[in-house]
């Protein structure tokens, strides 16, 4: 009756909602198996949340047949790997596009599973066409591992087997018939991936995967000829390679060659033959005294889970190597096993070899192989090999650590140790021998597993308990096959003692696209991980795992952007350093030049300071003052003097040609006489000279404006005012004007040499340009006269409208220029 209830509960499709945002949806149909020989208890009825003491539970149940992977986990998975530019989106998209073919494959697998459900208590070997599916309740916390298998005839693909590490707290012993079918845990899921990949036109061989639970004993079973093994706590002297050495009397369980999932194993020195279940039954065992009820009748009992606290049962028990995600990131389930055609294993079939060493009874060791997730670039092939001693009650089972996961994926350590009795000829596997409290830190593409102390309560018979860290023995595919021909275990003891101290903590930078490439030498070299692999000394105790800050790396439009919770150390690249050195060198040289220049400037300033401050005299009032107090042309001490002077000059146009030269301006400054006093007499005496020289003086030498000195008339124009009656009274008393007049007559031939013609109508374009430049504030406008090709005659014809409209000159400069032109005409 219990069997029927279990079968009914399993055959129905169910969906499991995992509290830690990890959702795994598959479809399954399984028949329950009862133990017919070793125990009378049946597997408790499966309920999704019945008796859940800890919600960090994963139950892998197949869901609706045509359901697309449209869950939040799958969508986030696609987005994450798209951002990280992994090669994972192809298969995820393929799963979505080919969900109809998935449904067909799943339907076929369910039909095959239902046909095999009738074999409830059967422990006989299953043929290829009928492989039973099982359900498993491994703890009262309702952690259920529901797996299914499918007949090889329904899906003509070669798929590797599944090795399942089963176990939890307070669960009765598992029969060999159950354990035999645990191995087929993910056959249908892998087949789905193969169907999808082949529908895309790819030949995709799938390697096997390892499903483990952290509180379980090890079960390594062949699908057809199950040979169980008890995982014993390996000590430093008993660390074996991935393929256990079994030169004498090694027993290898293989399938018949007619099966699609046959195991082709290299033959060792001892004859390796397919063993039946009946032969394996002779290796019965008593329960271990450490509380590990390891009923090791291999055909009947594979392993018994050890009694532990429920705290260690937080890790997921599922057919997909997924771990509950605390950080809310989905992990890679087997349904989303990413198939990389360029990095898949070259063999379709992975062999799970279980070998015995009856002649080494005390040192029988079981190698615990853990693969927490599937690497993004390779489908991991992992198997369990155990040396099953004749006295299995003396080989207690190690307890696996509770690994709380903060991410979607745990690291698969890339390694292959291929030997004669290797589990796979090209399989990639990794040895993680857990003993007492090694700090373990597994990281994957965007994850980081925080280390947890491994609770190990059992020890080997001969070797006392030691603190031995995780053994990591990766082998590259390029390394030649190492055949374990050593018969002395002490050599391996020495190597293992070296290797045990090499694994401290493994922390791979998250987000790096390349998988962690682990390389290892001949065995004494410490394995290296591309991210970081802190190595411990041989004599030092293993330190606590260093939890490094998680750094996310993004590639956005060609720019590598790293994102971390802590500030990055300031490290300048060599190129920047060189540039900085060059800049500093240039700056230093420039500073030296600047210093030299500043020294020269200082010298010149000192020379100038040594010179007396220039003193000016107002041309109107005769006030003597420093030059900086004089404004504009430095001729007048104030604007009042300038205005009064200009009013006087307006009356007598172009009177003294000598006033335009700087030498001439200084002499009348010496006396209080005003040059305007002699205006009347000058006009009377020399009317002809006034017209010629006055006109010529209106265009002084071009160097005069640079001295700040301009002609009389230029100053007049800047201060032009209507003549007021006060202007006449503003002039001082007449003084001897003969002197200044004679001086002006002396300068007349000098000034006429500088100009081409005294008649404005004879000026050319350059003369007009110089004339306009001499006007204050009209230097920029002079260029416009040159561009318009205005010569002397055109200048005489210019009017205000021409200046303002045609030449686009502002009103102020236009009035000044026109006033000057009028003066020239009048003169």
Swiss-Prot record:
Compositionally skewed regions (Basic and acidic residues) per UniProt: 485-498, 661-675
Chain intervals with Polar residues compositional bias: 517-538, 687-696, 708-717
CDD domains: SAM_Ph1_2_3
Entry-linked Gene3D superfamilies: 3.30.60.160, Transcription Factor, Ets-1 (1.10.150.50)
Extent of motif HD1: 540-570
Chain sites annotated for binding Zn(2+): 618, 621, 637, 641
Compartments, as annotated in UniProt: Nucleus
Region (Disordered): 1-78, 282-316, 482-545, 653-730
Gene Ontology BP annotations: negative regulation of DNA-templated transcription
Protein name in UniProt: Polyhomeotic-like protein 2
The organism of origin for this protein: Danio rerio
């Amino acid at each position: 009756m219990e069997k029927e209830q279990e079968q009914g509960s399993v055959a129905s499709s169910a969906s499991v909602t995992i509290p830690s945002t990890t959702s795994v949806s598959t479809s399954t149909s399984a028949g329950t198996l009862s133990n017919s020989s070793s125990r009378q208890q049946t597997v408790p009825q499966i309920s999704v949340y019945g008796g859940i003491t800890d919600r960090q539970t994963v139950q892998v149940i197949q869901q609706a047949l045509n359901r697309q992977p449209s869950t939040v986990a799958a969508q986030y998975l696609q987005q994450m790997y798209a951002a990280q530019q992994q090669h994972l989106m192809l298969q995820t998209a393929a799963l979505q596009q080919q969900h109809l073919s998935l449904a067909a494959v799943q339907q076929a697998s369910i039909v095959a599973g239902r046909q095999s459900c009738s074999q409830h208590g059967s422990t006989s070997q299953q043929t290829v066409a009928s492989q039973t599916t099982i359900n498993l309740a491994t703890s009262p916390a309702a952690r259920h591992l529901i797996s299914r298998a499918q007949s090889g005839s329904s899906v003509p693909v070669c798929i590797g087997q599944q090795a399942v590490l089963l176990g939890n707290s307070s669960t009765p012993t598992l029969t060999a018939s159950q354990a035999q079918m645990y191995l087929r845990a993910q056959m249908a899921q892998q087949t789905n991936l193969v169907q999808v990949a082949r529908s895309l036109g790819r030949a995709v061989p799938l390697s096997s995967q390892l499903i483990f639970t952290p509180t379980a004993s090890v079960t390594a079973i062949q699908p057809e000829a199950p040979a169980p093994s008890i995982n014993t706590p390996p000590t430093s002297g008993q660390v074996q390679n991935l393929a256990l050495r079994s030169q004498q009397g090694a027993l290898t369980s293989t399938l018949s060659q007619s099966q699609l999932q046959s195991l082709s194993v290299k033959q060792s020195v001892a004859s390796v033959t397919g063993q039946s279940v009946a032969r394996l039954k002779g290796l019965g065992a008593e329960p271990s005294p450490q509380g590990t009820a390891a009923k090791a009748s291999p055909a009947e009992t594979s392993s018994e889970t050890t009694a532990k606290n429920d705290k260690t049962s937080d890790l997921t028990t599922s057919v997909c190597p997924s771990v509950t995600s605390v950080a809310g990131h989905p992990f890679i389930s087997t349904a989303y096993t990413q198939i990389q055609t360029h990095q898949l294993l070259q063999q379709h079939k992975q062999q799970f070899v279980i070998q015995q060493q009856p002649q080494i009874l005390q040192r029988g060791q079981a190698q615990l192989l853990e693969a927490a997730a599937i690497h993004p670039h390779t489908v991991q092939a992992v198997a369990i090999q155990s040396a099953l001693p004749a006295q299995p009650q003396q080989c207690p089972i190690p307890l696996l650590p509770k690994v709380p996961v903060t991410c979607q994926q745990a690291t698969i350590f890339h390694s292959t140790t291929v030997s004669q009795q290797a589990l796979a000829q090209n399989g990639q596997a990794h040895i993680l021998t857990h003993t007492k409290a090694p700090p373990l830190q597994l990281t994957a593409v965007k994850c980081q597993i925080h280390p947890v102390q491994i609770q190990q309560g059992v020890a080997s018979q001969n070797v006392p308990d030691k603190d031995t860290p995780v053994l990591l023995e990766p082998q590259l595919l390029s390394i030649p096959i190492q055949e374990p021909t050593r018969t002395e275990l002490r050599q391996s003891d020495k190597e293992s003692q070296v290797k045990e101290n090499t694994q401290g903590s493994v922390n791979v930078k998250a987000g790096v696209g390349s998988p962690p490439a682990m390389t290892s030498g001949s065995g004494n070299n410490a394995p290296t991980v591309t991210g970081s692999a802190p190595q411990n000394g041989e004599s030092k105790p293993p330190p606590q795992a260093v939890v490094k800050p998680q750094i996310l790396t993004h590639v956005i439009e060609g720019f590598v952007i790293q994102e971390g919770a802590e500030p990055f150390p300031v490290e300048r690249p060599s190129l920047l350093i060189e540039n900085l050195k060059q800049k500093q060198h240039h700056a230093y040289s420039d500073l030296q030049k600047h210093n030299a220049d500043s020294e020269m400037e200082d010298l010149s300033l000192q020379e100038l300071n040594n010179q007396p401050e220039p003193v000016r005299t107002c041309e109107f009032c005769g006030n003597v003052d420093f030059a900086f107090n004089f404004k504009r042309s430095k001729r007048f001490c104030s604007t009042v003097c300038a205005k009064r002077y200009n009013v006087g000059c307006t009356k007598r146009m172009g009177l003294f040609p000598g006033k335009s030269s700087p030498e001439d301006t200084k002499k009348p400054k010496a006396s209080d006489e005003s040059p305007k006093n002699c205006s009347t007499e000058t006009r009377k005496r020399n009317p002809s000279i006034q017209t010629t020289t006055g006109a010529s003086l209106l265009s002084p030498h071009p160097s005069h404006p640079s001295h700040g000195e301009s002609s009389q008339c230029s100053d007049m124009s800047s201060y032009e005012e209507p003549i007021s009656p006060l202007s006449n009274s503003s002039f001082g008393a007449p003084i001897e004007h003969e002197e200044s007049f004679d001086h002006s007559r002396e300068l007349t031939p000098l000034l006429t040499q500088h100009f081409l013609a005294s008649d404005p109508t004879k000026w050319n374009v350059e003369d007009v340009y110089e004339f306009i430049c001499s006007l204050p504030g009209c230097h920029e406008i002079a260029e416009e006269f040159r561009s318009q090709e205005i010569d002397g005659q055109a200048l005489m014809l210019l009017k205000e409208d021409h200046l303002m409209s045609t030449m686009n000159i502002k009103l102020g400069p236009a009035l000044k220029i026109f006033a000057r032109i009028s003066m020239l005409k009048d003169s």
